């Protein structure tokens, strides 16, 4: 009974050391926190968390692609571009005398090597690249309007009323 007088009873939801009884897991943000945890003798696990949001396509999708290859019995070809589309771009670039790949690439903002690989059909073309090339050629290169001129239409403030 004497022990009851020496202990303090705490009432409330935020009282206590939490559940589990073990040390709490925390994420260490910098080197000084890591050193402090090591000096305190805590269990320290240093594992890098790899995000795929900002990494390139070849690194991000390689695991998924290899899984697809492992599960299939036949040969799985990597994704390639459309050779017909590449030839169409090259023909129109030369027909309109927009210069060689280097000059045209600078005009539309695509690297010369990337433009060469697109024209050869080695890589799939992205929508951003399609838009840039269409602006440079001033014509549609895909879809229902393929070959039609891509004309900029401006509406004046007076016409909108």
UniProtKB/Swiss-Prot annotation:
InterPro entries to which the protein is assigned, alphabetical: Cro/C1-type_HTH, Lambda_DNA-bd_dom_sf, MBF1_N
Domain HTH cro/C1-type residue range list: 90-144
Biased composition (Polar residues): 27-36, 52-65
Domain of life: Eukaryota
Keywords (A to Z) from UniProt: Activator, DNA-binding, Transcription, Transcription regulation
GO terms assigned for molecular function: DNA binding
GO terms for cellular component: nucleus
Sequence ranges of Gly residues compositional bias: 14-23
CDD domains, per database record: HTH_XRE (cd00093)
Gene3D superfamilies (UniProt xref): lambda repressor-like DNA-binding domains (1.10.260.40)
Stretches the record annotates as Disordered: 1-66
DNA-binding region, residue intervals: 101-120
Family: Belongs to the MBF1 family.
UniProt function note: Transcriptional coactivator that stimulates GCN4-dependent transcriptional activity by bridging the DNA-binding region of GCN4 and TBP (SPT15), thereby recruiting TBP to GCN4-bound promoters. Involved in induction of the ribosome quality control (RQC) pathway; a pathway that degrades nascent peptide chains during problematic translation. Required to prevent stalled ribosomes from frameshifting.
UniProt-listed PANTHER family: ENDOTHELIAL DIFFERENTIATION-RELATED FACTOR 1, ENDOTHELIAL DIFFERENTIATION-RELATED FACTOR 1 MULTIPROTEIN BRIDGING FACTOR 1
Protein name: Multiprotein-bridging factor 1
Lineage: Eukaryota, Fungi, Dikarya, Ascomycota, Pezizomycotina
């Amino acid at each position: 009974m004497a022990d009851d007088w020496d202990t303090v009873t705490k009432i409330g939801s935020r009282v206590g050391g939490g559940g589990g009884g073990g040390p709490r897991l925390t994420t260490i943000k910098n080197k000084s926190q890591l050193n402090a945890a090591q000096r305190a003798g805590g269990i320290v696990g240093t594992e890098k968390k790899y995000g795929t949001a900002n990494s390139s396509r070849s690194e991000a999708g390689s695991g998924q692609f290899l899984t697809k290859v492992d599960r299939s019995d036949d040969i799985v070809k990597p994704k390639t571009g459309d050779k017909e589309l590449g030839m169409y771009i090259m023909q129109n670039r030369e027909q309109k005398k927009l210069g060689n790949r280097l000059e045209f690439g600078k005009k539309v903002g695509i690297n010369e090597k990337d433009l060469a690989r697109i024209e050869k059909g080695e890589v799939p073309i992205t929508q951003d690249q399609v838009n840039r090339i269409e602006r440079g050629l001033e014509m549609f290169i895909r879809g229902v309007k393929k070959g039609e001129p891509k004309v900029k239409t401006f509406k004046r403030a007076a016409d909108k009323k």
